Amino acid sequence: LYYEIHITTLIKQSSHHLEIPERIGAWIGRAGLKDEALKQTHYDKDYKHYTFGSPFPREKEGVYKQGRVYVITIHSSVELTLRRISAALQALQEDEYFQFIAASPVQSKKLTHITELTTVTPAIVTIEGKPWVPDLSVELLLQRIHANAEKKYNHLYPDQPVRLEQPFVEGIQVLNHKPIALAYKGRKLLGNKLRLLVREDEYSQKLASVVLGSGAAEKNSILGAGFCIAKGLE
């Protein structure tokens, strides 16, 4: 089970598609400072359990245009987190890049059986402080994505910790020829779009569901990295 909202926004300054994730993350983060619970997670440096996709409709030239209206989808593993984000964005209304227009009600989403996950935004995995790139071991990438998902699950459900003998993903495909560079704090963070084939057992399914809500790998709430869509049975 995961949750979803759609935020309709007017873009106040044109933004390149590799720069806009940082700007969206900063807008949501700034709004979150108006909410005590969201503010606390900001200072705790813990998993925030939400992530967001690229604004829709996509722009073919790769630049989101000033004065146009777009929709941003936000996922979370925690329903209340989305309610708080929605209220906080309405309270903040705008920053230098975005003007809030509307928020949809929070919807709960459930797939009874997830067969695969695709990261629509690049997933960011760092190994010893450096980004995973396609020259490195795919096995290592798989292990890191699994370990991250397991930590998120155990953070959400500390009373029912899970440790799997094998990764929840049985196959992985890198969908880009070269890494994608997202702007972050004046530098670039490299990520990759991935297709993850999910195992059928109960715990693998639980981890896949957490990845749908909280995002795959790192920088989910700050850059919308690892925002996933799923294939499976409703």
Model-identified regions with their sequence ranges:
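RNA-interacting cores
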Residues: 1-234
